[in-house]
Amino acid sequence: MKNRHGLMGLVVALLTALSMIVAAPQAQAANRDWLRPDSTGTCEWDRVGYWVQRCTVWSPAMGRHITVQIQPAQRGGNAGLYMLDGLRATERTNAWVQDVNAARTFVNHNITLVMPVGGQSSFYTDWNAPATYNFNSPVTYKWDTFLSKELPAYLQRHFGVSPTNNSILGLSMGGTAAINLAALHPQQFRQVLSYSGYLTTTIPGAQTALRLALLDGGLYNLNAMWGSIFDPRRYENDPFLNMGNLRGRDVYVSAGSGTPSARDDRYLPQHKAAGIALEMVANFTTRLWSAKATATGVKHTAVFTPVGLHNWEQFGYQLNRSKPQVLNVMNAW
C-alpha cells in the first residue's frame, strides 16, 4: 500500500510540474495573443510583428483618435515604457518601431511598450493655440493631457499598465519632452531617459533655434506652443529649470559628441552635416543640464560618447545601452 501511495504521489508531482512548464508559456502568450478593444472597435496587429498592436485611443482634449503602437508585457506585468519620437514624427508609425525595432529589443521582457504615433513638432506638450499657420485647418495639440490623463486610463483598463509605474524616454524633441513630462508628472513616471535631447530651452539663442526648427518641421508657430518669451509657460517647460521635481526618480541623459564614426558612413553628406550640428547642440545643452543637476543634488546617469551624430545609429545605441537600467529600475526582466 505504501509503495502504491508513493507511486501515486510521484505521478501527481510529475503532472503538477509538467502543468507548470506548459502553463508558463501559455500565460506569457495569453497577455499578448489577443487584440484589445480600442476607440474604433478593436486594435489591429502591426506589420512589424513582435506582438505589437495598433490601437486608436480617443482624445477628448484633441478631438480625434490617436494611434498608439503597443507591445504588451510578456508576462502581464504592470510596468509601462512610453517611447517618444523626434521632431519629424509621422502619422504612419512611431520611429522607435520603424528605425530600430524597439519591439524586438524588448520582446522577451515584462514591460508594456507604449509608442504614440504623430505629434510632429509638438514637443508632446499642451499648446496654447492652434499649432500651425494654416488657420483654415487648425491643428490642436494637447499631448501632455493625452499622455498623462487620457492614455493612462486606457492602458490600465485594457493592458493592465499601472498609472504610477512607468518609465518614459525620448530622442531629440522627445528627449526634451520626456524630461518635462517626468518633472510635471512625477507620480506617473518613476524613470526618465533623454537621448540627445535639448535640455535648456530658454538660454540665449535657444528660442530662435526652436522657432526655426518648428518652421522647418511643418510651419509650426512657436508662440502658439508656450506663448511669448514673457509667458511663464516657456520657463515651466524648460528642463533646465524644472529638474528639481526629478529628485527621487531614476534619470538617464546622453548625447554623442558630433564626431562621425564608421557607423555613420551610410548617411548622405548633407544628413551627416546636419547630424553633426544637431548633436553638438544636444551635447552642449545636456552637459549644462547635467552640471546643474550634479550641483543641486539631482542624481542621474550621464553618458557622453566620444563619437555619434544626431541619427538612429546614436539613438539605437543608447536604447540598447540603457536597456538594463530600464529593466532593473522597472523590475521588468
Regions from the language model: what does each represent?
Residues M1-R4:
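N-terminal secretory signal peptides that target proteins for export/translocation
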Residues G6-L10, Q26-W333:
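Non-catalytic cap/lid and distal C-terminal segments of serine-dependent acyl enzymes
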Residues L10, L14-A17:
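Gram-negative bacterial Sec-dependent N-terminal signal peptides
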Residues A17-Q26:
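C-terminal segment of classical bacterial N-terminal signal peptides
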